[in-house]
């Protein structure tokens, strides 16, 4: 007879669906192939399909080894129309097979804390995971932890419609700081989105992130006068944590002034299971120290941030760093417009000759760090020293920063860079 849903369905299994949209039912038989589904159909039987082939579909956001999905009211509220997992199903992918054992218990959102994957860079639940907990009966205010999440892809005009503040009785207390640890106002999980944050984000919680970006090819626009303040210790105003080809247009205020606060943190992070098990970064994928030839499958075959643009109206303040780039994260270009306010070190630990890079990628990826515009019109005031602008930062990127001073600039700090090209009046005041 094989396996089936015996006895009763608990609050979790009662929300399970297969890739054909069939809901789990008591006594329903579980099969492994579509051919078995069709055979059962001819006999008037509805069966539950759980494939065990583990075939990867390019562009999927899960490497789960099964094809089961969790659906519920709260989950639907969070993921909306997102198609997730191998099969592009509107539900949370669940790992079905544990070797030859039918498991159907582990959430398989990419890289998540609750997944059963060998590489994870979350220290807290995703909003979809919290929604799942609500659907199985837990009662709490999910919005204390997440303001918004984008699980859908190809949204070309996503606009925020509220900020992130303290909560009471299920409502935002506008203007009051949210004290929740690990809180995130906006999480972009998916790909090919253009998202504009135009409402304030106020957090005082430890290890919070105002905005977190994963996925690939996402563009984030922080609107003029928008405040993203994460004042708790070890917090980030903006965290770019996974993927490739992201673009940032920063016109607002990013501030992270607690202990070791980082305004813009660009970092894949460490594997919560240990880096010796599996390690990921830009153009880097290692298993047990050995390079893997599957970068595209895991959205690692590109620059993490294509362009980081701090525009003239922007303010970027961090107690540890205004901009921090980890040794596993490649940023192609940083443009800091004249008069942009920057307070806090600009740090890059990326090394184009990182030993974890495969040989074909070594000595190829440097970061252009541009202060001011490179246009001839903007440099017409070359001799007008009253146009000099000040940046309060040490610039620390000896291995990879190619720094261009395109406008009159007083750097109130030191510069340790790979290359310096001065096209205007440049002063070091550190």
Locations of the language-model features?
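Extracellular zinc-dependent metalloprotease catalytic-domain scaffold
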Residues: 3-160
């Amino acid at each position: 007879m094989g396996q089936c849903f015996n006895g009763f369905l608990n609050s979790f299994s009662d929300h399970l669906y297969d890739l054909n949209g069939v809901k789990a039912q008591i006594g329903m038989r579980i099969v492994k192939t579509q051919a078995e589904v069709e055979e059962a159909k001819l006999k008037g039987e509805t069966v539950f399909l759980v494939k065990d082939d583990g075939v990867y579909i390019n562009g999927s956001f899960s490497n789960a080894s099964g094809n089961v999905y969790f659906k519920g009211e709260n989950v639907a509220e969070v993921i909306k129309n997102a198609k997730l997992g191998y099969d592009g199903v509107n539900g949370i992918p669940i790992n079905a097979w544990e070797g030859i054992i039918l498991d159907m218990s582990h959430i398989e959102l990419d890289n998540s804390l609750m997944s059963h994957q060998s590489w994870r860079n979350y220290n807290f639940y995703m909003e979809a995971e919290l929604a799942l907990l609500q659907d199985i009966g837990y009662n709490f205010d999910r919005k204390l932890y997440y303001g918004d999440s984008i699980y859908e892809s190809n949204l070309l005009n996503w606009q925020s419609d509220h900020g992130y503040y303290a909560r009471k009785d299920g409502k935002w207390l506008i203007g009051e700081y949210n004290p929740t640890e690990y809180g995130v106002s906006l999480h972009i999980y998916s790909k090919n989105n253009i998202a504009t944050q135009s409402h304030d984000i106020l957090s005082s919680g430890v290890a919070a992130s105002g905005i977190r970006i994963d996925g690939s090819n996402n563009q984030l626009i922080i609107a003029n006068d928008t405040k993203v303040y994460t004042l708790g210790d070890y917090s980030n105003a903006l965290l770019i944590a996974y993927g490739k080809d992201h673009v940032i247009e920063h016109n607002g205020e990013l501030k992270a002034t607690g202990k070791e606060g980082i305004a813009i943190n660009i970092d894949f992070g460490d594997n919560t299971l240990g880096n010796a098990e599996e390690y990921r970064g830009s153009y880097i994928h290692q298993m047990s120290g050995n390079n893997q030839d599957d970068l595209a499958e895991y959205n690692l075959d590109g620059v993490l941030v294509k362009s980081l643009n701090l525009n003239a109206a922007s303010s970027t303040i961090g107690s540890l760093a205004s901009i921090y780039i980890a040794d596993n994260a490649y940023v192609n270009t940083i443009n800091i417009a004249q008069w942009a306010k920057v307070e806090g070190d600009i740090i890059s630990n990326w090394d184009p000759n990182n030993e974890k890079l495969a040989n074909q990628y070594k000595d190829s990826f440097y970061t252009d760090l541009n202060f001011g515009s490179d246009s001839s019109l903007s440099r017409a005031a070359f001799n007008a020293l009253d146009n000099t602008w000040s940046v309060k930062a040490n610039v620390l990127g000896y291995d990879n920063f190619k720094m261009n001073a395109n406008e009159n600039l007083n750097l109130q700090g030191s510069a340790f860079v790979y290359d310096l090209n001065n096209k205007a009046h440049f002063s070091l005041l550190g």
